[in-house]
Amino acid sequence: KHTTLKLILELKHHSTPEREDLAAEKIVKMVERMKLQNRVEYITFSANALRTLLKNAPKGTPVYYLNGEMTPSQLKELGCAGLDYHYDVLRKHPEWIDECHRLGMKVNVWTVRNTDVMREFDGRADFLTTDLPAEALKVVNK
């Protein structure tokens, strides 16, 4: 029905790296079984799950890291499509936005619940996670 809709799948932390590995492997297989590979992007706070997703997902599948401590260069070396960090991380490291773009990577900021913050990252971040989509559209469309 909504064949152009992107699906963002977050893999949560698990109690052990082995459980994360198993979850990542099963999730990638499920996405393939449902023939959603071209629509799914993965996000995770876990560096272990990140590596397992990158290893198991089809080459070119967008995988983003959420935790905030890795530099764009580190993420690029792992094979990430970009970073997906809280806006406070990018306020501390504003140079990471340009670095990501120079490396051909995308930038997402989360979770923005304030129009001033939306304006701060408008035109700099590629994506914005928010609970206020109508307000975000007003900022972007100005």
Language model: regions and residue ranges:
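Short loop-to-alpha-helix "cap/lid" segments that border enzyme active sites
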Residues: 1-142
